[in-house]
């Protein structure tokens, strides 16, 4: 039998023998290598006896991971060339000029101001300067205002609170009629999280630094979101049996047994709470990655909106 390879002009002879009406290659033939004249492509045909299968496993998953890793490197390079990191002593006017340039650039779909800003800058003034159509962080006053109003939808929702609610949805947690408690009232997490829980028809309470006997409220919570950055503040005795706990807080504490002498913990005492709650997010690990995922989701939403893609 003659073989043909599309990149070769030379035919090759393979010896066959008949076994019960089926033509099979002779086991003695071991390998043929067919090359192009430019030696840029190689076709190797291995023929072995059926008694010794040793085919190479083509691992698509492993190769796909390598490709994704390569893409990550390229995306990182692009971010470095597109994004701007002003010097810490930059003036507010310089930062506003950068923001204005990104607002006007049609190739930019999202603008994010990394907080906190240096003390000599007016944080609210700079956040207000970001176009609401590109406010993928969701902190523009108009986006927060729409989030607070019934019948209005913000163009973007703040990423960490959005990630908390998305986690609950993906684990089929029921909201309607449930008692939800949010610890913390920051503009970044606490207040938006409370507003989102209200939109889900939960009955919401907010605990802050002036709340008396906070544990009395948390013991009633079917859903508890904590975002204050106080290590292990929420003890097991604060938790209603079967509650669902989302721990946004993260803080380093001393631990001689850990690398560097420190480890990261959340607001909720995980060891105690995990024995009482029906579901809990570990720290570090769950909410942080969800924040990044929601930022990417918001940026994709912005790009689709700009290009009128449904």
From Swiss-Prot:
It catalyses: (6R)-5,10-methylene-5,6,7,8-tetrahydrofolate + NADP(+) = (6R)-5,10-methenyltetrahydrofolate + NADPH; (6R)-5,10-methenyltetrahydrofolate + H2O = (6R)-10-formyltetrahydrofolate + H(+). GO terms for biological process: photorespiration; tetrahydrofolate interconversion. One of its GO terms (molecular function) is methenyltetrahydrofolate cyclohydrolase activity. InterPro entries: Aminoacid_DH-like_N_sf, NAD(P)-bd_dom_sf, THF_DH/CycHdrlase, THF_DH/CycHdrlase_cat_dom, THF_DH/CycHdrlase_NAD-bd_dom. Gene3D superfamilies: Leucine Dehydrogenase, chain A, domain 1 (3.40.50.10860), NAD(P)-binding Rossmann-like Domain (3.40.50.720). Its EC number is 1.5.1.5, 3.5.4.9. Belongs to the tetrahydrofolate dehydrogenase/cyclohydrolase family. This is Bifunctional protein FolD 3, chloroplastic. The gene is FOLD3.
């Amino acid at each position: 039998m003659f073989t043909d390879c599309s990149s070769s002009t030379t035919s090759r002879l393979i010896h066959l023998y008949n076994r019960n009406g089926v033509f099979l290659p002779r086991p003695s033939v071991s390998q043929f290598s067919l090359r192009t004249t430019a030696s840029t492509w190689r076709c190797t045909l291995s023929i072995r006896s059926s008694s010794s299968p040793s085919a190479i496993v083509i691992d698509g998953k492993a190769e796909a991971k390598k490709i994704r890793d390569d893409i990550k490197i390229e995306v990182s390079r692009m971010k470095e060339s597109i994004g701007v990191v002003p010097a810490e002593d930059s003036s507010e006017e310089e930062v506003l000029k950068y923001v204005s340039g990104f607002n006007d650039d049609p190739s930019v779909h999202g603008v994010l101001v990394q907080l906190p800003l240096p003390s000599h800058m007016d944080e609210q003034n700079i956040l207000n300067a970001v176009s609401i159509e590109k406010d993928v962080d969701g902190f523009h006053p108009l986006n927060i205002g729409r989030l607070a109003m019934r019948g209005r939808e913000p163009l973007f929702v703040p990423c960490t609170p959005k990630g908390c609610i998305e986690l609950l949805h993906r684990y089929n947690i029921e909201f309607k009629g449930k008692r939800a408690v949010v610890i913390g009232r920051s503009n970044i997490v606490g207040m938006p999280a409370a507003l989102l829980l209200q939109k889900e028809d939960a009955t919401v309470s907010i605990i802050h630094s002036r709340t008396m006997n906070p544990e009395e409220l948390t013991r009633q919570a079917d859903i508890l979101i904590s975002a204050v950055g106080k290590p292990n503040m929420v003890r097991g005795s604060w938790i209603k049996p079967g509650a669902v706990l989302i721990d946004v807080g993260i803080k380093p504490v001393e631990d001689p047994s850990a690398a560097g002498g420190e480890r990261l913990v959340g607001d909720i005492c995980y060891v105690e709470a995990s024995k009482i709650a029906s579901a809990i997010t570990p720290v570090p690990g769950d909410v942080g990655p969800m924040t990044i995922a929601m930022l990417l989701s918001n940026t994709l939403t912005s790009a689709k909106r700009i290009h009128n893609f449904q």
